[in-house]
Amino acid sequence: MEKQYLTVTALTRYIKTKIEYDPHLQSVWLKGEISNFKNHSRGHMYFTLKDENARIAAVMFAGHNRNIKFRPENGMKVLVKGKISVYEASGSYQIYIQDMQPDGIGNLHLAYEQLKVRLEEEGLFSQVYKKTIPPYAKTIGVITSPTGAAIRDIITTIKRRYPIGNVIVFPVLVQGESAAPSIVQAIRTANEMEEIDVLIVGRGGGSIEELWAFNEEMVARAIFKSEIPIISAVGHETDFTIADFVADLRAPTPTAAAELAAPNIIELQEKVLQRTLRLQRAMRELVHKKEEKLQVLQKSYAFRYPRQVYEQKEEQLDRALEQLVLAKERYIDKKVNQLKQLSFYLEKHHPSQKIMQTKVAVETLQKQLQREMQTLLQAKEFAFVRAAQKLEALSPLKVMMRGYGLVYDEEKQVLKSVKDVSLGDAVSVQLQDGILDCSVSGIEERELNNGK
């Protein structure tokens, strides 16, 4: 019988079919530690689940992981639910996760702690960014449920404490999946209204699930970006949400938030009364001091004898005028003398004198330069004539005029000895008026005088 060979693809698909038709592998509850975690740009999560002895590849698609509240990280222990299948391209089996929870700690609690740490590292909780709550807000915005007890407590408290204040309510959902976007939109709408001085954002008490909208990152960032100061009032005094950390001021309850946002009009009236009394007291004291000063002035010599004081001052004025006239004359005399001295100095040091002196000096130097140049030129001309005469005396042409000539070999080199030629060599003889081409037909060597 001929053997049937399977392709790798066929075998892999067969194994995949076997696994996917196994009911025990289509609903698997698994716990392990996350490693090699990667969050794809399309939202899918890829990682490995492992324990001490084994590991399995894991995939959680975006459609499932968008519902988890915490952020998976390497080293985190988790509980997952999913199904086992085979990834044909690599031939490896892996778990496709449908739900994931942290192992040993609540899902929402872990998400809360992770977001709290991350936003704190970004500086969203820093006191540097906290805005001051206005002490006398004219218009107070309230972002909460329109039907809960919180809105009734807030409005009742504001109207009781500050009946002249305005309240604008922004009704929102305070729990459920749509609550966070609803709160964010209300904060943005309030910031577009110029008349609002302060915002209260909150709701009544509840479980962590019911309060979760105020732990959402989008709500925290909307509070941080708000130009209007925000007072958070979420739950009871023991409840702390992310919104409380980001807000400019945290109130333990909605009623307390209303008390922080709205001043007590009775206390304000008491302050106005106290300041009015202090102002009246200060005015009375000022009037009393002025009256005492007036009485002193009325008893003074100037007030009792104004004519004598006038005459004395008139005499002082006359003397002052005389001194002023004398001082003016002395000042003018002094300036006239200074002007004369400056005129004399200027005349003595007038530039025309220096220009004349410089002109004479330049003319003298010019004449001297001309004389020296003439002398130098004559000396150079005399030296040139003598040098020309010496050069002419040494010129070969002078020698040739006395009957001498220069003999050259075929290479136009001057012959200095009969030893430089041989019989039959062609030579040239240069005379003063031309050149003779000759041939050596005989050589007669002579001894030079003095043995040279």
From Swiss-Prot:
Recorded catalytic activity of this chain's protein: Exonucleolytic cleavage in either 5'- to 3'- or 3'- to 5'-direction to yield nucleoside 5'-phosphates
**Record keywords: Nuclease included?**
yes
Give compartment(s): Cytoplasm
Ordered alphabetically, the record's keywords are:
Cytoplasm, Exonuclease, Hydrolase, Nuclease
Write out the GO MF terms. Answer: exodeoxyribonuclease VII activity; nucleic acid binding
Keyword Nucleotide-binding, does the record have it? no
One biological-process term from Gene Ontology?
Answer: DNA catabolic process
Specify the protein name. Answer: Exodeoxyribonuclease 7 large subunit
List GO terms (cellular component aspect): cytoplasm; exodeoxyribonuclease VII complex
Q: What does this protein do?
A: Bidirectionally degrades single-stranded DNA into large acid-insoluble oligonucleotides, which are then degraded further into small acid-soluble oligonucleotides.
Q: Hey, which family's this protein in?
A: Belongs to the XseA family.
Major place of residence: cytoplasm
Describe its partners and assembly state. Answer: Heterooligomer composed of large and small subunits.
Pfam families, alphabetically? Exonuc_VII_L, tRNA_anti_2
